[in-house]
UniProtKB/Swiss-Prot annotation:
This is Lipoyl synthase. PANTHER family: LIPOYL SYNTHASE, LIPOYL SYNTHASE, MITOCHONDRIAL. Binds 2 [4Fe-4S] clusters per subunit. One cluster is coordinated with 3 cysteines and an exchangeable S-adenosyl-L-methionine. Residues 70-287 form the Radical SAM core domain. Its cofactor is [4Fe-4S] cluster. GO terms for molecular function: 4 iron, 4 sulfur cluster binding; lipoate synthase activity; metal ion binding.
C-alpha cells in the first residue's frame, strides 16, 4: 500500500485516506501552470505569518495562487488550528483530532492584519465539529480583533457549515457583521456523498439563505469546483439554487487533486468553458462572478469586493 508522505508533525496529514486506492495525479495543462513562489514580498508575507504563529489556508490547502497573493501581501488566515474534523475527498487540509482553541489567536490575526496593511482580509477555518458552537464565537472574536487593530479593513469570512449546532451559533457570526459572508457549496448535490461526505448540500444552501434573512445588507458569496464529474446542467442548477438563496457572488474554479489518495480529476475544464459559465451566471443575476481555472474563494478578494460594492450601487441606482 502506498503511503501519503505529507505530514503534520510526526503523523500523516490524511490518515483516513491511507487505505484509498492510488489514482494518478494528472499533468496540468499549460493554462494551470504557475511560477514557483519566492519573491521578496512573498518572503516578507511569510515572515509576518510565521512570526505571529498563524496558519493560512494558502499553505494548508496547497493553493496554486500562493505565489501571486503573497507577493501582493495578501493571505487568507485559517483560524482554529490546522487539523479539521471532516475528511472531504478534495481537501488537502489535515484531518484528525484538533487541539484546544488558542484564545490569543484572534488578537494575533488582528495584529498581522494591521502589520501587513491589509485593506481587505479573508478569514477561514477548519471544521470544528468537536466544539459546542462549531467555533462560531472564535469567528466573532476574530472579527472584533481585526476591527480593533485595523478599523478601515474590510472583512470577509469563509465559514464551515455549523452542522448540528444551535442556530444561535450561526446568528452570532452574522451579527458580528463581516462585510462578506462566504460559505462554499463546493460541488453539485449528486457528488456530495463521495466528495463532501460530512456535509449536506441543502443544509449549506439554507445557511446562505439564513444570512440574507437575518441581514439583507450583508454580501453573501459561495463557490464550487468543476472537473469532478459534474455536468453543465448540474452546475447551472447550483447557480439557480444560489440565486434562490440570495447569493450575491459566485466563484467557479478547477478542482486540482492534492495527492494520489484524493478524489481523481475527471477532466480539466478549458478556459473557454469557464468564460461560458461566467456569462450564464451573470445572466442569472449574480452581482459578481469569478470563473476561471485558477479561481479560488479568496483569490483577488480585495479587488472583487470593490467591484461587488460598485455592482450593488449600480443596481440600486438603476432601480
Amino acid at each position: 500500500m502506498a503511503v501519503v508522505i505529507d505530514t503534520v508533525g510526526a503523523r500523516p496529514r490524511h490518515p483516513e485516506k491511507q487505505a484509498n486506492p492510488d489514482t494518478p495525479v494528472l499533468r496540468k495543462p499549460e493554462w494551470l501552470r504557475v511560477r514557483a513562489p519566492g519573491s521578496a514580498n512573498y518572503m516578507a508575507t511569510r515572515e509576518v505569518v510565521k512570526s505571529n504563529r498563524l496558519v493560512t489556508v494558502c499553505e494548508e490547502a496547497g493553493c496554486p495562487n500562493i505565489g501571486e497573493c503573497w507577493d501582493k501581501s495578501h493571505a487568507t488566515f485559517m483560524i482554529m488550528g490546522e487539523v479539521c474534523t471532516r475528511a472531504c475527498a478534495f481537501c488537502n487540509v489535515a484531518t484528525g483530532k484538533p487541539l484546544a482553541l488558542d484564545p490569543d489567536e484572534p488578537a494575533r490575526v488582528g495584529e498581522a492584519t494591521a502589520k501587513m496593511g491589509l485593506k481587505h482580509v479573508v478569514v477561514t477555518s477548519v471544521d470544528r465539529d468537536d466544539l459546542a458552537d462549531g467555533g462560531a464565537w472564535h469567528f466573532v472574536e476574530t472579527i472584533r480583533a481585526i476591527r480593533a487593530a485595523s478599523p478601515a479593513t474590510t472583512i470577509e469570512i469563509l465559514t464551515p457549515d455549523f452542522a448540528r449546532k444551535p442556530v444561535a451559533a450561526l446568528e452570532s457570526v452574522i451579527d458580528a457583521r463581516p462585510d462578506v459572508f462566504n460559505h462554499n457549496l463546493e460541488t453539485v448535490p449528486r457528488l456530495y456523498l463521495s466528495i463532501r461526505p460530512g456535509a449536506r448540500y441543502y443544509h449549506s444552501l439554507r445557511l446562505l439563505e439564513r444570512v440574507k434573512e437575518r441581514d439583507p445588507t450583508q454580501f453573501t458569496k459561495s463557490g464550487i469546483m468543476v472537473g469532478l464529474g459534474e455536468s453543465k446542467e448540474e452546475v447551472m442548477q447550483v447557480m439557480d439554487d444560489m440565486r434562490s438563496a440570495g447569493v450575491d457572488f459566485i466563484t467557479i474554479g478547477q478542482y486540482l487533486q492534492p495527492t494520489r489518495k484524493h478524489a481523481p480529476i475527471d477532466r480539466f475544464v478549458h478556459p473557454d468553458e469557464f468564460r461560458a459559465l461566467e456569462e450564464i451566471a451573470r445572466a442569472k443575476g449574480f452581482l459578481m462572478v469569478s470563473a476561471s481555472p485558477l479561481t479560488r474563494s479568496s483569490h483577488h478578494a480585495g479587488e472583487d469586493f470593490a467591484r461587488l460594492q460598485a455592482a450593488r450601487l449600480a443596481k440600486e441606482s438603476a432601480a
